[in-house]
């Protein structure tokens, strides 16, 4: 039995015996966070937050710094891995009703928003062509805010256009936000262990629990090993798979790329933004696409917690997953038919899931004849 209180805490942590592989993503996210902070620190040591030197400093890191290429690729691909894990983690929470642990769910969605902000600021730092124009387009959405929009945008930019002050403050924010993420993650884990994890059956697992270590810790190690293996294979053989070709050119404010788009993990929100032909409407839809996740614990009306035994909810859940993938794909395409109508239809379907959520619960209660 370990004597150190932290080891004892994890060793004796009671966990349901029947949690599946879908519960492994929390530990994978923790590993991704540690990797990002570590590689980010080594990159920050060599990076220069200046519009004339930022792009050159990235080239310097990749070419001249020992193992700089590894740090740079691990940081970029690690961000994609982070988002893959967090989207699966949220999907598992939706499917198995983990959102009924309200405080944990709320802290988790706050974590997602902080992570998205951190990733956005990081995407601007290389000062490539796509970095510059994606930052211009996204920050310009603030001008849609009535009365305060222009003042807010000028304040964020530090001037009347994206320039050196913008890059400096984005670097400062990109450096400080991971510490916010670490704090929120600690809070998330503390809140989770107040009530304990849910399980695939949605039953009260108190009568059948086992210690986290060695049982679940060894189970977690399998997927962790596979994730790190996948990360290193991608880094070694396909290092530029997630990169935009335009970002290999230095930012030029005088030349607009043919098709401006952010990183793939923001494309679903960007696709929803683009599907509405109005600036304020699009900006509101973009914000709502994330914020609507906060409403889920309050719209759960089913008597059963998970979707394991709820066929209608399962159908809508997998429709949501396919919708998410389709919006992401459509957002990579130019704004022209048929991609406009595909984006609009999938955006409507995306919001339909959340709006129909309470109705589905009531319908399923009636189907099961539960009082």
Curated annotation (Swiss-Prot):
Cited InterPro entries: Cyt_b/b6_C, Cyt_b/b6_C_sf, Cyt_b/b6_N, Cytb/b6-like_sf, Cytochrome_b, Cytochrome_b_C_euk/bac, Cytochrome_b_N_euk/bac, Di-haem_cyt_TM
Cofactors required: heme b
Spans through the membrane: 25-45, 69-90, 105-125, 170-190, 218-238, 280-300, 312-332, 339-358
Residues annotated to bind heme b b566: 89, 188
Binding site for a ubiquinone: 193
Protein function: Component of the ubiquinol-cytochrome c reductase complex (complex III or cytochrome b-c1 complex) that is part of the mitochondrial respiratory chain. The b-c1 complex mediates electron transfer from ubiquinol to cytochrome c. Contributes to the generation of a proton gradient across the mitochondrial membrane that is then used for ATP synthesis.
Subunit field text: The cytochrome bc1 complex contains 3 respiratory subunits (MT-CYB, CYC1 and UQCRFS1), 2 core proteins (UQCRC1 and UQCRC2) and probably 6 low-molecular weight proteins.
Protein's name according to its UniProt entry: Cytochrome b
Organism of derivation: Apodora papuana
Gene name as annotated: MT-CYB
């Amino acid at each position: 039995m370990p004597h150190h209180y932290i080891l004892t805490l994890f060793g004796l942590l009671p966990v349901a015996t029947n949690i599946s592989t879908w519960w492994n993503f929390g530990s994978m996210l923790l590993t991704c966070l540690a990797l990002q902070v570590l590689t980010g620190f080594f990159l920050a040591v060599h990076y220069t937050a200046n519009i004339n030197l930022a792009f050159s400093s990235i080239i310097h890191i990749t070419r001249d710094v020992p193992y700089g290429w590894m740090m740079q690729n691990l940081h970029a691909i690690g961000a994609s891995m982070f988002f893959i894990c967090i989207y699966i983690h949220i999907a598992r929470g939706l499917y198995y009703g983990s959102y009924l642990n309200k405080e944990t769910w709320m802290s988790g969605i706050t974590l997602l928003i902080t992570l998205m902000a951190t990733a956005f600021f990081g995407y601007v730092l290389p000062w490539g062509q796509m970095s510059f124009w994606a930052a211009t387009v996204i920050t310009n959405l603030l001008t849609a805010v009535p009365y305060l929009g222009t003042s807010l945008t000028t304040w964020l930019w530090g001037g009347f256009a994206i320039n050196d002050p913008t890059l400096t403050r984005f670097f400062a924010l990109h450096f400080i936000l991971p510490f916010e993420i670490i704090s929120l993650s600690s809070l998330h884990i503390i809140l989770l262990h107040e009530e304990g994890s849910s399980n695939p059956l949605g039953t009260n697992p108190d009568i059948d629990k086992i210690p986290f270590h060695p049982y679940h810790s060894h189970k977690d190690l399998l997927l962790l090993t596979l994730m790190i293996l996948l990360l290193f294979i991608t880094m070694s053989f396909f290092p530029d798979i997630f990169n935009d070709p335009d970002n290999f050119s230095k930012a030029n404010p005088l030349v607009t790329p043919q098709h401006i788009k952010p990183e793939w993990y923001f494309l679903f929100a960007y696709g929803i933004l683009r599907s509405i032909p109005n600036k304020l409407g699009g900006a509101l839809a973009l914000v709502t696409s994330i914020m609507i996740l906060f409403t889920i614990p309050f719209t759960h009306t089913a008597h059963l917690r998970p979707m394991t035994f709820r066929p209608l909810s399962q159908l809508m859940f997998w429709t949501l997953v396919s919708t998410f993938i389709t919006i992401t794909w459509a957002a990579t395409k130019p704004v022209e038919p048929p991609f406009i109508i595909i984006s609009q239809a999938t955006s409507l379907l995306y919001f339909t899931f959340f709006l129909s959520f309470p109705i589905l619960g009531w319908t399923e209660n009636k189907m099961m004849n539960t009082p």
